[in-house]
Amino acid sequence: MLRKLTPLALALLPLVAGQTIGETPEVHPKLPTWKCSNRHGCVKQDTSVVIDAATHWIHEKGGETSCTGSSGPNPNLCPDKETCAANCVIEGISDYANYGVQTKGSSMTLHQYLRDGNTTKSVSPRVYLLAEDGENYEMLQLLNQEFTFDVDVSTLVCGMNGALYFSEMQRDGGRSELNPAGAARGTGYCDAQCFNIPWINGEANVEGAGACCNEMDIWEANARATGYTPHPCNITQLYECSGAECEANGVCDKPGCGFNPYALGAHDFYGYDLEVDTTKPMTVVTQFYTKDNTTTGALVEIRRLYVQNGHVIQNAVVSVDGESVDSITADYCADPSSAFNRLGGLQRMGEALGRGMVLAFSVWNDAGSFMSWLDGGNSGPCNATEGDPALIEKLHPDTHVTFSNIRWGDIGSTYRGKRR
């Protein structure tokens, strides 16, 4: 919906744009990636990452008062979006290591905690992949393609989640007169959980809306459990929800239709010294097959495989309703009462992958449920309390995840390994 501004507000927009970006420079850590094809091999891209806008210092122009309050934008500085843009400055970040992000070559490590003198602080970074121009997000279109990365989860204990996923954010991060920084400062985040966040597309969320969009979780994991999950929505790109639209029966599928080997009965497949051995780095491959095997066809299957020690490891084969299953298909997600199917299922998820999605990386833990939905109870081997963030901070302050060698392209073009 277009907003109507008064002539005075329109006159101020160029001034607002000039005031919004602070003086501290933004230095994006380099993280090269590769685009691959069966015909031409893999071509290196000079890509980089940017940390989420909310991690940046957003403060009063000419002062140090934060523009973010305890439950949203500071109401004194941000009574409305236009006033907020005039009052507030978003600073750059010149050293991402201070926020738990370290890159070296084609590798990136995300730390949950940092030592600061005699204290430990939680930083829990979330970053997005920028295109070679450094101003816009890299948009990945993955229908009838595969996405591959190497990962080391060996220090991610119970209760941790080193995540890699796709979000249907806007390419420019919602760059506008009120948000001239855009993707270059990490604006525009959204996902299928439709969270009420202080800033939506870089503008003050004074209405308390939720930021919704299609989400494809490629990798949610620690050393004890893993899952991959499509979360379709019945909207495109970032949608500002309100009321019931943001809830369980709203515009997005919050639980999704996931594949967690442990939850499906394969208890000896993934973990310490198991078939996929999490004490060692591994290669993770996710393939998006279409009905007609073209990059414009309907998504019909999301397949997973691993490569470790030079050998290809097929995904765990599990039994669901008496059928052997090792991938996500319409039959696997067949529950007609699920939000997944109500909102369009694989068809809708595929449409988002066809339009293009932004790659996000994060590391986090969960004070509410101790990440038990991922690695406890029926979902994994972790007990009810060991995922407590207070316990993790005390016993495992160096917990981190390392992602590297990110590539995508034609199916079969991004990995090598011997079949067992």
Curated annotation (Swiss-Prot):
The keyword Cytoplasm does not apply. Its EC number is 3.2.1.4. It comes from the Eukaryota. It catalyses: Endohydrolysis of (1->4)-beta-D-glucosidic linkages in cellulose, lichenin and cereal beta-D-glucans. Gene3D superfamilies: Glycoside hydrolase, family 7, domain. It is found in: Secreted. Residues 1-18 form the signal peptide. Glycans are attached at residues 118, 234, 293, 383. Keywords: Carbohydrate metabolism, Cellulose degradation, Glycoprotein, Glycosidase, Hydrolase, Polysaccharide degradation, Secreted, Signal. It holds the Pfam family Glyco_hydro_7. One of its GO terms (cellular component) is extracellular region. GO terms for molecular function: cellulase activity. One of its GO terms (biological process) is cellulose catabolic process. SUPFAM superfamilies: Concanavalin A-like lectins/glucanases. The active site is at 215 (nucleophile), 220 (proton donor). PANTHER family: 1,4-BETA-D-GLUCAN CELLOBIOHYDROLASE B, ENDO-BETA-1,4-GLUCANASE CELB. Has endoglucanase activity on substrates containing beta-1,4 glycosidic bonds, like in carboxymethylcellulose (CMC), hydroxyethylcellulose (HEC) and beta-glucan. Involved in the degradation of complex natural cellulosic substrates. Belongs to the glycosyl hydrolase 7 (cellulase C) family. This is Probable endo-beta-1,4-glucanase celB. The gene is celB.
